[in-house]
Amino acid sequence: LAMFRLFRINYFNPIVKIFATYLEPVSKSIFFFLNPLLAALALSLLLKFVSFYIAYSSGYEPLTLFFISVVDVVNSCFRILFYCVIGSVILSWVAPGNNHPLLQIVEEMSDAILQPIRKFVPPMGGLDFTPIIGLVLLNLINTSFIQIISSMV
């Protein structure tokens, strides 16, 4: 839900409506003092922290588990974006212009990542190299973030 809000995915999409219907009341009731984007992120962090605390409560301090949950949530977000970009590349070959709701979400999320890169890298000879650059940048940012947070723990 946080990624749908962050990338401004169309809320008339049936899949987004289902997620919003079930997850928005939970995040609003627990984190009523935050805006909806931060509430959804806080809910995902809380759920990840509770799952790690239940699994590893005897071996780690709670602050360490919190940092591990932050790293895992951010890593999951980057993996989703990574696979959305790969999915949009495959879909552009296989089924361009398909109106399936899930495919629309994949296209909108990958376009949000690739659109700033397309401003700097024009298509060369009919080939679009922005997905390759986007995947490299996503991997670089994810790896550097994980190393920075891991060094803090």
What are these regions (language model features)?
Residues L1-V153:
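Selective transmembrane helix interface/packing segments
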